[in-house]
């Protein structure tokens, strides 16, 4: 069977919104070099290749147009959405393996559609970025210290992939941000973190609006980012920013509006001793089209 190639918009139920990904299923007969060529040809920020696995339900490899990466949140949602549709799955929990390890994925079926949930890695936090580094980040975003939520740090947070959390006051016009990309690239090299995630909390709601800039790895702005919204949820618990019941915090993370690709990620943080213990990101997707690879590979 020739590989089937799918164009999927993830973290949205509306076509041409959310974050697009390529999905190739099945991909067992493809070499690594062929996967890289296909990812380059499709041109998505990430393309997911679904493979047989001996120690889990499915193995996924992720490629940008230039390099293989360990895992990708929106491409994972896209991949499992396609797999569930093709196989006609019902409600189930499965395990996937990737270069990032083994992860639990929950698939929920609602009215012939699917909601995909991915359990991310263990939350972690680096020391706050202070002094010249903090000032450089604020300047690179063309903000001032007065735009930052008072009493909270600019800090690298991770649930497997580190991102810089930059909490903004709600009155800041986040859609108007136009960062100095060269400056952000230089800061990335200095701190060893490629993603900058300014975000703000919607007043009176457990909802946020964010944007994600990663110029150091060739992504000027990512539309909707699982590997940013997940750590953000953990960061919000770590600093006790939003109210919760001591067991779970649920946050809706909105992103992509400034690009005309608005989407939403549901972030669920399991809490122990007032600290984040586990983070799960959830979302749906929409398949725009799929095709069979026409040439012999």
From Swiss-Prot:
Classification of source organism: Bacteria, Pseudomonadati, Pseudomonadota, Gammaproteobacteria, Enterobacterales
Organism: Escherichia coli (strain K12)
Protein name: Uncharacterized isomerase YddE
InterPro entries the record matches: Phenazine_PhzF-like
GO cellular component, one term: cytoplasm
Self-association state and partner proteins as the record states: Homodimer and homotetramer.
GO MF annotation: an example: isomerase activity
Membership in a protein family: Belongs to the PhzF family.
EC number(s) given by UniProt: 5.1.-.-
